[in-house]
Amino acid sequence: MPFLFVSGTGTGVGKTFSTAVLVRYLADQGHDVLPVKLVQTGELPGEGDIFTIERLTGIAGEEFARFKDPLAPNLAARREGIEPIQFDQIISWLRGFDDPDRIIVVEGAGGLLVRLGEDFTLADVASALNAPLVIVTSTGLGSLNAAELSVEAANRRGLTVLGVLGGSIPQNPDLATMLNLEEFERVTGVPFWGALPEGLSRVEGFVEKQSFPALDAFKKPPAR
């Protein structure tokens, strides 16, 4: 059962829309895809990232946990006075979707080193499942540093970063943004997959024009 983890250089960089694009792309290649949100914070019942992904792709997903306050998951649990997420619980839950022909696309919470529980991060979960990563980055001033730091943190932990994807680019990008698009691949050392247009509301028409060769490494499902 292959996993693909999607992490960001921070919060609000376009990670959910990027996850939706990757989910739809894999589904269009004939894969059985299950989108998963590990932890949602700060959203009302029936709202949040996993519902956005379903709305954009038409593919329903699963969510492990949610907390009321828009905080890092361990802090949100602490504030609510409930037991924090346990590492073994989340690994067991993910492995419960066991199906050799399914790809589980896992959206993290914030960045790679955000604490999901008191003593573990998204990087630890990805490592335990031997899962590759896609890093979603902002594209404006300061983004090169954030992207390089995220890729370096992943590499130090023995994780494979398949690519860096810009979560949002304005219709009229400024000079810093335009130059950053040319530099991401050089400074991170991994392929840069381009950037999603700001205000993207549908993924189907957009995905049809995209190519993510690194995702072709996932075994194609048998013809039926």
Swiss-Prot record:
Top-level EC class as recorded in UniProt: ligase
Keywords from UniProt, A to Z, are: ATP-binding, Biotin biosynthesis, Cytoplasm, Ligase, Magnesium, Metal-binding, Nucleotide-binding
A GO cellular component term found in this entry reads:
cytosol
Asked if the keyword Transcription belongs to this entry, the reply reads no
Question: Catalysed reaction(s)?
Answer: (7R,8S)-7,8-diammoniononanoate + CO2 + ATP = (4R,5S)-dethiobiotin + ADP + phosphate + 3 H(+)
Q: GO: which molecular function terms?
A: ATP binding; dethiobiotin synthase activity; magnesium ion binding
Q: Which cofactor does it need?
A: Mg(2+)
Residues that coordinate or bind ATP: 12-17, 107-110, 167-168, 197-199, 204
- Where is it located? Cytoplasm
Q: Please state the Enzyme Commission number of this protein.
A: 6.3.3.3
Q: Where is the active site?
A: K37
Q: Record's InterPro entries?
A: DTB_synth_BioD, P-loop_NTPase
Annotated substrate binding sites? T41
Q: Does the keyword Phosphoprotein apply?
A: no
Q: Which residues bind Mg(2+)?
A: T16, E107
What HAMAP family does the database record attribute to this sequence? BioD
Family affiliation? Belongs to the dethiobiotin synthetase family.
Q: What does this protein do?
A: Catalyzes a mechanistically unusual reaction, the ATP-dependent insertion of CO2 between the N7 and N8 nitrogen atoms of 7,8-diaminopelargonic acid (DAPA, also called 7,8-diammoniononanoate) to form a ureido ring.
Question: What is known about its subunit structure?
Answer: Homodimer.
Instruction: Provide the protein name.
Output: ATP-dependent dethiobiotin synthetase BioD
